[in-house]
Amino acid sequence: MKIVTWNINSIKTRLNLLRNFLSKENPDILLLQEIKCETEKFPFDELSDLPYNFYVHGQKSYNGVAIISKFPADEIIKDFPNNYYSDQARFLEIKLSLPIGFCNIISLYAPNGSFVGSDKFVAKLAFYDNFINYLSTKKSFDEKTIIGGDFNIAPFDIDVYSPKLLAETTCFTEIEQKKLRTILNSGFEDLYRLMHPCKQEFSWWDYRAGCFEQNKGMRIDMILGCNNTIDYLENCYMDYNLRTQEKPSDHIPVIASFKK
């Protein structure tokens, strides 16, 4: 079983890349972020020939998340309690039966935070506080939960191209990292880092000339699995090929494979 997360950065612009990716990788579940379209303008018709169910929480021009799944959802949730950004489409959860058991699958697009000290940065921290509180309710029920998304936080020095240059800049501050570690310490694992403890790879590069070619990136896209999913994990890796295609997203997919 294969679960993928990908910040597609406009599904309209990247529709052909999406179709090719689905055909090549054949994921069981694909979590998308930054689809940048309203729910009713999601390309349902253009993808209707594919063997998937489509769950969408869209927003005009900005944000937007979706879950594309071979398995039908029993329940769909489009927000969590006290979400600071409840007016923005940044969260989508489905509950469904999978080969590894009944699961909660979450597609998350965390806010960037603008610059350190700004109102948006403070709001980002509040978003994380409330998301952490929401996850704690799942832990109390011992539910299987997998979160995929653009977290807009690089966890450790190994996850950025230059810790010195990026020190205490947005997405790489100690206070942001503490929020992410609170999630990890509450019973979740960063599946890529679990499989590759010392490997340096990135999931995002600025579009500015040379950033991808010079590998000046950050690893801010992740799949987190709660502890009761780890025994099923086979591998977790990234697909660099999509960043070399024409009109790519600035993010690449993160792929986790599980035993059936």
Regions found by a protein language model. Name each.
Residues 1-52, 62-65, 155:
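N-terminal, active-site-proximal structural segment of metallo-dependent hydrolase catalytic domains
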Residues 35-115:
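Structured beta-strand-rich core segments of catalytic domains in phosphoester-bond hydrolases
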Residues 81-82, 110-128, 164-169:
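Surface-exposed cleft-lining segments at the edges of enzyme active sites
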Residues 1-10, 102-117, 148, 251:
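Active-site-proximal beta-strand elements of phosphoester/diester hydrolases
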Residues 9, 36, 109-111, 152-154, ...:
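Catalytic metal-binding/acid-base residues of hydrolase active sites
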Residues 50, 127-220:
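Metal-dependent phosphoesterases centered on the DNase I-like endonuclease/exonuclease/phosphatase
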Residues 61-76, 199, 210-232, 258-259:
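Conserved beta strand-loop-helix elements of the APE1-like EEP
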Residues 237-260:
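Surface polyanion/phosphate-binding segment centered on an Asp-His-Pro turn
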